[in-house]
Amino acid sequence: MPIRPLSVLTALLHVYIALRLLPALASLTPAWPLALVLLAVSAVTMPLPFVSRSHRADRKAKPAGETLHWIGLISMGWFSSLFVLTLVRDLGLLLAWLANALGGLQVPWDKVGPWSALAVLALATGVSLIGFVNARRTAGVKQVDVPIRGLPAALAGFTIAQLSDIHVGPTIRNGYIQR
C-alpha cells in the first residue's frame, strides 16, 4: 500500500481513538491533553519508518533520522495495542449498554467510561513497554541434540544453527545477533 493512503488511514484511526477515549478522560483528569499530544505524535511519526526505508545509506550520517525511525516504530507498537484495546473497550461498553437497556445490569456510566478509558491507555502503554524491553533483551540460546538414525559418518558431529523469531532489521542489527 502506498504511504499516503496508509498515513491517512492511520491518522483517521488515531482520530477514532481520540474521540473514544479523550472525552471520558477529560472528566477524570486534567492531564487528558497529554494523551492528545501522544496520539498526535504517534499519528505523525508512524509513517517515518516507511519513508526512511529509502534513506538507509544516510542513517549513519544522520543520527536524528535514526531516532525518528525508532520513534515511529515505537509509535506503531503503542498504536496497535491502543487501537485493539479501544475496540475491546467499545465492545465491552456496548455489551454493558445492552445489559443496562434490558434491565439486567445497573451501570455506573460516570465511573465506567472514564476509568475504562484510563485503563486502555495504561494497558497499552504497559504492554508496549514490556514488548520493547523483551525485544531489546538478548535472545536466549538453547542447545538441543537431535539424534538422527542412519546419519552418514561424514555428517557425524555436524552442527546446525537455527535462528528463530529474531527479526533482523532496522532496530535489531548485526551487533545484537553477535551478542
Model regions and ranges:
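Non-catalytic terminal accessory segments
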Residues: M1-A139
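Membrane-embedded segments
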Residues: R136-Q143, P147-R179
